[in-house]
Amino acid sequence: MLRSHAAGLLREGDAGQQVTLAGWVARRRDHGGVIFIDLRDASGIAQVVFRDPQDTEVLAQAHRLRAEFCVSVAGVVEIRPEGNANPEIATGEIEVNATSLTVLGECAPLPFQLDEPAGEELRLKYRYLDLRRDDPAAAIRLRSRVNAAARAVLARHDFVEIETPTITRSTPEGARDFLVPARLHPGSFYALPQSPQLFKQLLMVAGMERYYQIARCYRDEDFRADRQPEFTQLDMEMSFVDAEDIIAISEEVLTELWALIGYRIPTPIPRIGYAEAMRRFGTDKPDLRFGLELVECTDFFSDTTFRVFQAPYVGAVVMPGGASQPRRTLDGWQDWAKQRGHRGLAYVLVAEDGTLGGPVAKNLTEAERTGLADHVGAKPGDCIFFSAGPVKSSRALLGAARVEIANRLGLIDPDAWAFVWVVDPPLFEPADEATAAGEVAVGSGAWTAVHHAFTAPKPEWEDRIESDTGSVLADAYDIVCNGHEIGGGSVRIHRRDIQERVFAVMGLDKAEVEEKFGFLLEAFMFGAPPHGGIAFGWDRTTALLAGMDSIREVIAFPKTGGGVDPLTDAPAPITAQQRKESGIDAQPKRVQRHDQIFAVTTSHPSVNK
């Protein structure tokens, strides 16, 4: 070993010991010929002092040190002189009196100072330097502890950790695939998996019964501020279980994770139905750290003459004290709504004497003005925001306004934790709504799956999949923490007939189903057990535990919001030779052979023989 001790673990009890340390120069200070450096390694920082005037060679070497030089230092641990202790660091009572110094690696001029703020693009370009800083390094190390804690829980429950393929065939799962050309099969492509969904179900058919994996997943989605094209899930699947069993195991995992940061999650975690969550909070990911619930006003305005409120849905959310906002702030709310694709955000101001003001109030009848404040629970000095239009989009706007109001008023305790299970979502949603929300609607039908096509309906709804499609409830559950969905799962379909019916509702024809999912349907014919599971978004979960706003902070080498890696400059063009070798431009032709569909290409020499 190049060192005998970890720098950050030295204490007063080590005084008198000869030690060899190795790490980086965090700081260098020169005080009248005596040189001090803060030596940093993975364990922390220790002060090293070069003070022997007789050892001119070591002093000369120390004079040449600069920030982030990688060095090895030998010396004796000593108690710091009286008055020189540093209570800010764990090693603040001691220092190492250096007797030798070896420079293991010099450091070029730094692109940014590690003890000063830097822009994200620069940080990601030099991520290996960024990770030398305390907070980024701590976040990555916490992630390792999170992995270990989850594995320990699942090992106690006899789960088997199994790796599933990361190059497979392209199957529609709700997002676009990343495609990989298959060089030995010109014109054909592998796909990087969006999830291990199909393989973990096959593992249940195989009799594994309890599977998990910390799985890498890939989705070619449109650029979003806090999404990554590659991400990680804690993926779990169990046979012979119902939703209650999966929720119980999940709560045990979550309890163990939050114990890492000293918080005990009260269990059982409360539950709320999907429909209730949408009605009260405008979202299926409600933040329950504060109130400000939405108020349904559709019936209240059922006879209104105000055309804006003559809509399928009218709802409101109250901003306490919001009537004092200046006009420019209220105008800013309109811009805020327009940025979210809406025409604006109607409002009524409740004056201190209870009278109503603002542009909407003058369009209301006397009866509406008289009863409005009581109906929505507004008090003098409050502002009432409204949204009117289609139910889903109007509620979504009010749900976003609710969170924005809470942020502006400081109503959210950043140290609080609020967990909730959102259960009983619909199995299907209109395909046009999914597309409008930026999702990929699988199939060509009027309906697509809310979660994915393999989610089972609640047993009592099985007979109404075709006749009452929009009302069918899924046997599914999402876990939400502080307004973030950190996991989601369901009981799966394990019968071929039900799976085929779901595919049909989604507009997948039999030929497409057989081509893309035939292997799964065939497996269901060989004694498939009832099964279900859940997947936790591991990046988001770890970010919450680390107190980070962005998942990029808990990923060792993340991409930007635009999907670019500033460090390696990926993605990058390929060479003409790579393009030729990959067969990416080959034109496949479908032929039927031995009841199987194969991809061949007329441009490949072996085909033309």
From Swiss-Prot:
Protein name, please?
A: Aspartate--tRNA(Asp/Asn) ligase
Which annotated residues bind L-aspartate? 173, 219, 451, 492
One GO molecular function term of this record is:
aspartate-tRNA ligase activity
Where does the record place the region Aspartate? 197-200
Organism, as annotated:
Mycobacterium bovis (strain ATCC BAA-935 / AF2122/97)
- Organism phylogeny: Bacteria, Bacillati, Actinomycetota, Actinomycetes, Mycobacteriales
Identify the enzyme class: ligase
Relate the assembly described in the record: Homodimer.
Positions marked as site (Important for tRNA non-discrimination): 31, 83
